[in-house]
């Protein structure tokens, strides 16, 4: 919906744009990636990452008062979006290591905690992949393609989640007169959980809306459990929800239709010294097959495989309703009462992958449920309390995840390994 501004507000927009970006420079850590094809091999891209806008210092122009309050934008500085843009400055970040992000070559490590003198602080970074121009997000279109990365989860204990996923954010991060920084400062985040966040597309969320969009979780994991999950929505790109639209029966599928080997009965497949051995780095491959095997066809299957020690490891084969299953298909997600199917299922998820999605990386833990939905109870081997963030901070302050060698392209073009 277009907003109507008064002539005075329109006159101020160029001034607002000039005031919004602070003086501290933004230095994006380099993280090269590769685009691959069966015909031409893999071509290196000079890509980089940017940390989420909310991690940046957003403060009063000419002062140090934060523009973010305890439950949203500071109401004194941000009574409305236009006033907020005039009052507030978003600073750059010149050293991402201070926020738990370290890159070296084609590798990136995300730390949950940092030592600061005699204290430990939680930083829990979330970053997005920028295109070679450094101003816009890299948009990945993955229908009838595969996405591959190497990962080391060996220090991610119970209760941790080193995540890699796709979000249907806007390419420019919602760059506008009120948000001239855009993707270059990490604006525009959204996902299928439709969270009420202080800033939506870089503008003050004074209405308390939720930021919704299609989400494809490629990798949610620690050393004890893993899952991959499509979360379709019945909207495109970032949608500002309100009321019931943001809830369980709203515009997005919050639980999704996931594949967690442990939850499906394969208890000896993934973990310490198991078939996929999490004490060692591994290669993770996710393939998006279409009905007609073209990059414009309907998504019909999301397949997973691993490569470790030079050998290809097929995904765990599990039994669901008496059928052997090792991938996500319409039959696997067949529950007609699920939000997944109500909102369009694989068809809708595929449409988002066809339009293009932004790659996000994060590391986090969960004070509410101790990440038990991922690695406890029926979902994994972790007990009810060991995922407590207070316990993790005390016993495992160096917990981190390392992602590297990110590539995508034609199916079969991004990995090598011997079949067992």
From Swiss-Prot:
The active site is at 215 (nucleophile), 220 (proton donor). One of its GO terms (biological process) is cellulose catabolic process. Its main location: secreted. Keywords: Carbohydrate metabolism, Cellulose degradation, Glycoprotein, Glycosidase, Hydrolase, Polysaccharide degradation, Secreted, Signal. It comes from the Eukaryota. GO terms for molecular function: cellulase activity. Glycans are attached at residues 118, 234, 293, 383. Its EC number is 3.2.1.4. It catalyses: Endohydrolysis of (1->4)-beta-D-glucosidic linkages in cellulose, lichenin and cereal beta-D-glucans. It is found in: Secreted. PANTHER family: 1,4-BETA-D-GLUCAN CELLOBIOHYDROLASE B, ENDO-BETA-1,4-GLUCANASE CELB. Belongs to the glycosyl hydrolase 7 (cellulase C) family. Has endoglucanase activity on substrates containing beta-1,4 glycosidic bonds, like in carboxymethylcellulose (CMC), hydroxyethylcellulose (HEC) and beta-glucan. Involved in the degradation of complex natural cellulosic substrates. This is Probable endo-beta-1,4-glucanase celB. It comes from Aspergillus terreus (strain NIH 2624 / FGSC A1156).
């Amino acid at each position: 919906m277009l907003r109507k501004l008064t002539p005075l507000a329109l006159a101020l927009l160029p001034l607002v744009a000039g005031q919004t970006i602070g003086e501290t420079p933004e230095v994006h850590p380099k993280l090269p990636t590769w685009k691959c094809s069966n015909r031409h091999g893999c071509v290196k891209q000079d890509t980089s990452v940017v940390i989420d806008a909310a991690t940046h210092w957003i403060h009063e122009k000419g002062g140090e008062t934060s523009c973010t309050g305890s439950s949203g934008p500071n109401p004194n500085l941000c009574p409305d979006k236009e006033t907020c843009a005039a009052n507030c400055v978003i600073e750059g970040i010149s050293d991402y290591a201070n926020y738990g992000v370290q890159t070296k070559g084609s590798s990136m490590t995300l730390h949950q905690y940092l030592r600061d003198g005699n204290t430990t602080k939680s930083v829990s970074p979330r970053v997005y992949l920028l295109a070679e121009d450094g101003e816009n997000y890299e948009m990945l279109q993955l229908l009838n393609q595969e996405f591959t990365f190497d990962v080391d989860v060996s220090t991610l204990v119970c209760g941790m989640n080193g995540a890699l996923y796709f979000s249907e954010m806007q390419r420019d991060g919602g760059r506008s007169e009120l948000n001239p920084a855009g993707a270059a400062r990490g604006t525009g985040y959204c996902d299928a959980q439709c969270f009420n966040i202080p800033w939506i597309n870089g503008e003050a969320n004074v209405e308390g809306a939720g930021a919704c969009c299609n989400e494809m979780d490629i990798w949610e994991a620690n050393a004890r459990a893993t899952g991959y999950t499509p979360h379709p929505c019945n909207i495109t790109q970032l949608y500002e929800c309100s009321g019931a639209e943001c809830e369980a029966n709203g515009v997005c599928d919050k639980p999704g239709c996931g594949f967690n080997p442990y939850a499906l009965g394969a208890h000896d497949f993934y973990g310490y010294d198991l078939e996929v051995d999490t004490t060692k780095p591994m290669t993770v491959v996710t393939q998006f097959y279409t009905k007609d095997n073209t990059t414009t066809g309907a998504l019909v299957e999301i397949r997973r495989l691993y490569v470790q020690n030079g050998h290809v490891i097929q995904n765990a084969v599990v039994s669901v309703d008496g059928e052997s299953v090792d991938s996500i298909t319409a039959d696997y997600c067949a529950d007609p009462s699920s939000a997944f199917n109500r909102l369009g299922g694989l068809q809708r998820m595929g449409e988002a992958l066809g339009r293009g999605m932004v790659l996000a990386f994060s590391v986090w833990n969960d004070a509410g449920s101790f990440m038990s939905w991922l690695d406890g109870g029926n979902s994994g081997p972790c007990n009810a309390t060991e995922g407590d963030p207070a316990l993790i901070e005390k016993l495992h302050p160096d917990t981190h995840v390392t992602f590297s060698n990110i590539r995508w392209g034609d199916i079969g073009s991004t990995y090598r390994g011997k079949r067992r």
